[in-house]
């Protein structure tokens, strides 16, 4: 994020801004002066290429601190004044309640239920403020030990009771479907084409549209991406030679002697697939 172009004599604010806006506190919890002072503290933090480990190999990169390029003057950041460097900035950021809340809301959004898009968080409260508060407290109490925080999350009632509250990302759709149908445990001809399917659904793997990443939840779905999802899943589930599909068919055949009405067959199949919930095309009024 351009910190290699962040020098004591010419401060580049890109990394400082992204650190505060996207990766720790969120918009509205710092000032423009904080962005500049944060960026000053990270001057001299850069990357250095290493010699390739093999002929014509890729150049790895490693962190390098160039003391002569570091601004060692006094800085004031979020109310703290001193000869601050990048490590001090991280400590100060992690001591802010806004950071704990930001991390907690991201965890809730990833594991429990879709939240509004991140840029709106400054003005839009969480869907479940109590859950986010519980996670934020766990972040602070554990001093950012994510194992402890996730234990609180996974043991909570709001996590256990969450169902049909998240729209899968394209990567989750593709990987989950391939796991369900089976036969893709090891690399095989055609697996590369399967990996492209997420891109057709709107998530070009390892190529997010910006440093912010992808917008999730309902923004995964539009008329084109929905068709891609349905067609991909239908094609995989129609291949009765796949071990996972065969297992679903066998389990259905073993239920009630394999005798179902059309409605019962669809319901039983959906239960074995997820469960998956669908609505009637024309629900009763």
What are these regions (language model features)?
Residues 1-124:
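Non-catalytic, conformational "gating/processing" segments within enzyme and secreted inhibitor domains
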Residues 96, 100, 104-142, 150-285:
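Flexible, low-complexity segments enriched for small/polar residues
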Residues 31, 50, 146-150, 161-162:
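Acidic/polar loop patches that form or flank catalytic/metal-binding clefts of enzymes
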Residues 24-28, 54-57, 77-86, 147-152, ...:
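Short, Lys/Arg-enriched charge-dense amphipathic segments
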């Amino acid at each position: 994020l351009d910190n290699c172009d962040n020098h004591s004599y010419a401060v580049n604010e890109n990394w400082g801004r992204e650190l505060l806006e996207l990766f720790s506190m969120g918009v509205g919890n710092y000032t423009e002066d904080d962005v500049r002072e944060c960026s000053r503290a990270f001057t001299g933090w850069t990357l250095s290429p290493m010699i390739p480990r093999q002929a014509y190999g890729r150049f790895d990169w490693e962190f390098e601190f160039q003391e002569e390029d570091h601004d060692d003057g006094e800085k004031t950041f979020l109310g703290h004044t001193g000869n601050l460097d990048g490590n001090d900035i991280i400590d100060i950021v992690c001591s802010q309640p806004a950071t704990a809340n930001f991390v907690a809301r991201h965890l809730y959004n990833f594991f429990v239920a879709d939240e509004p898009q991140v840029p709106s968080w400054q003005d839009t409260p969480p869907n479940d403020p109590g859950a986010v508060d519980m996670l934020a407290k766990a972040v602070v109490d554990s001093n950012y030990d994510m194992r402890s925080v996730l234990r609180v999350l996974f043991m909570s009632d709001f996590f256990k009771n969450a169902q049909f509250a998240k729209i899968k990302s394209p990567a989750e759709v593709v990987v989950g479907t391939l796991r369900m149908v089976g036969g893709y445990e090891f690399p095989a001809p055609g697996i590369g084409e399967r990996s492209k399917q997420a891109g057709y659904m709107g998530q070009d793997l390892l190529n997010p549209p910006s440093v912010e990443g992808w917008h999730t939840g309902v923004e995964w779905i539009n008329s084109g991406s929905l068709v891609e999802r349905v067609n991909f899943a239908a094609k995989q589930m129609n291949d009765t030679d796949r071990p996972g599909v065969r297992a679903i068919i066998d389990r259905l055949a073993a239920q009630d002697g394999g005798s179902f009405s059309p409605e019962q067959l669809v319901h039983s199949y959906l239960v074995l697939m997820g469960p998956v919930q669908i609505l009637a095309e024309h629900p009763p009024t």
